[in-house]
């Protein structure tokens, strides 16, 4: 049986004709039987694709034949094409939607004016040398931090990346402007842009983790500064490092919104026609229509009606 894998990658580099790049990517992935999501802009490319391992290897080789993508780093993860509903290749103004396409500047070396890149071991060294002065700043949506984050991290109140500029300009984080700030996100791409936005707004000492949380977790498992699970954007929805939740060093952060039981599984509220919330829910509460809700009053009412109908 053929082994399947998921590839995660991004590359900031000028792309003169994003539409032509989109057509090339779509045709190549269809030929190789890969599924996933690829976003392309004039600033670069951001992709997550899954499929047969041999097909993934051929994809990597083809990508590196293109001059602008030769230095692209590909991360391999467990999974395959079955983890994605389809192949989606699109052109956008931004490959990560911060709402500031005109502010981002890139050249052949990547983002201009971003934070200093640190390898995982350099992150630990910075904390050893600077202690509690170091601030970890979560560059993801706040929801993702419910199941995992760096120890004592600052988690901004954001639902989407579009909210970050408003948050940075709110004054809430001005106390961090003279401190060493380590921005972090899943694979590193969001912090490439976020660190640049922060520097443009007066944050003086900004760092980012090479390879993001994924690379740090691969290096240290549950024995470093990371706590809990990692939210991922495929059908798995979360992953763990080391030996997972059974690891003695694993710290459980996620808990069911209804009963408080430990869980890392996000589920849709029962009121899917009106509510788009993903909430942490244990299997028992998800199976019961009465508790399969996000906790908002109207959604509780919808859940109660569903439970009553099921009881008839």
Swiss-Prot record:
This is tRNA uridine(34) hydroxylase. It catalyses: uridine(34) in tRNA + AH2 + O2 = 5-hydroxyuridine(34) in tRNA + A + H2O. Keywords: Oxidoreductase, tRNA processing. The active site is at 185 (cysteine persulfide intermediate). Belongs to the TrhO family. It comes from Corynebacterium diphtheriae (strain ATCC 700971 / NCTC 13129 / Biotype gravis). Catalyzes oxygen-dependent 5-hydroxyuridine (ho5U) modification at position 34 in tRNAs. One of its GO terms (molecular function) is oxidoreductase activity, acting on paired donors, with incorporation or reduction of molecular oxygen. PROSITE patterns: RHODANESE_3 (PS50206). Its EC number is 1.14.-.-. PANTHER family: THIOSULFATE SULFURTRANSFERASE/RHODANESE-LIKE DOMAIN-CONTAINING PROTEIN 2 (PTHR43268), THIOSULFATE SULFURTRANSFERASE_RHODANESE-LIKE DOMAIN-CONTAINING PROTEIN 2 (PTHR43268:SF6).
